[in-house]
Amino acid sequence: MRMTMEEMKNEAETTSMVSMPLYAVMYPVFNELERVNLSAAQTLRAAFIKAEKENPGLTQDIIMKILEKKSVEVNFTESLLRMAADDVEEYMIERPEPEFQDLNEKARALKQILSKIPDEINDRVRFLQTIKDIASAIKELLDTVNNVFKKYQYQNRRALEHQKKEFVKYSKSFSDTLKTYFKDGKAINVFVSANRLIHQTNLILQTFKTVA
């Protein structure tokens, strides 16, 4: 049975989403290793990137196996969210124009606020303020994306428009998840949705970096 375009997009999203642990967990490890042995770190990084590309989710499987072997009990989704705020070199836009650097800054700000959710979620007053901050950060990021659209012409504008729509879709999904959370109290669903929004934020940067 042939997949619809929407199903293909969803599968592609799931595939790239499952690779989040590569840059959220392993990249900081590689960066630390570079200080000790640059060559070994670069070789290991390249090997992980290649393996993850060929087998999406492999990094997550390896990490989970290590945790299991060491009998470490950890909420992986929550931990991933806490670590996902760091800049990822592969996603950062290198163009020096203020609009592009502003895009980097606004994306960083949103990711940092989202990554604080596990620390804020059990304090209702603080969490409500965090939700307001997230809404403001989302608006600021979208405003910056629109500013770049106005000032620069792109041959591949369709790809940028598509990624912007995806970001808006996941922003709305995050909002819906929050409404449900206040009814059922299931924090894990908020963490999952926040991770997806961080992933979409990175994809916006990646798309601009690719076509800019």
From Swiss-Prot:
Gene3D superfamilies given in the database record: 1.10.12.70, Nucleotidyltransferases domain 2 (1.20.120.330)
Stored Pfam families: PDC10_C (PF06840), PDCD10_N (PF20929)
GO cellular component: cytoplasm; cytosol; extracellular exosome; FAR/SIN/STRIPAK complex; Golgi apparatus; Golgi membrane; plasma membrane
Molecular function as annotated in GO: protein homodimerization activity; protein kinase binding
Domain of life from the UniProt record: Eukaryota
This protein's UniProt keywords: Acetylation, Angiogenesis, Apoptosis, Cell membrane, Cytoplasm, Golgi apparatus, Isopeptide bond, Membrane, Ubl conjugation
Complex and partners: Homodimer. Interacts (via C-terminus) with CCM2. Interacts (via C-terminus) with PXN. Interacts (via N-terminus) with STK25. Interacts (via N-terminus) with STK26. Interacts (via N-terminus) with STK24. Interacts with GOLGA2. Identified in a complex with KRIT1 and CCM2. Interacts with KDR/VEGFR2. Interaction with KDR/VEGFR2 is enhanced by stimulation with VEGFA. Interacts with RIPOR1 (via C-terminus); this interaction is required for the association of RIPOR1 with either STK24 and STK26 kinases and occurs in a Rho-independent manner.
Role description: Promotes cell proliferation. Modulates apoptotic pathways. Increases mitogen-activated protein kinase activity and STK26 activity. Important for cell migration, and for normal structure and assembly of the Golgi complex. Part of the striatin-interacting phosphatase and kinase (STRIPAK) complexes. STRIPAK complexes have critical roles in protein (de)phosphorylation and are regulators of multiple signaling pathways including Hippo, MAPK, nuclear receptor and cytoskeleton remodeling.
Family: Belongs to the PDCD10 family.
Disease / disorder: Cerebral cavernous malformations 3: A form of cerebral cavernous malformations, a congenital vascular anomaly of the central nervous system that can result in hemorrhagic stroke, seizures, recurrent headaches, and focal neurologic deficits. The lesions are characterized by grossly enlarged blood vessels consisting of a single layer of endothelium and without any intervening neural tissue, ranging in diameter from a few millimeters to several centimeters. CCM3 inheritance is autosomal dominant.
Protein name per the record: Programmed cell death protein 10
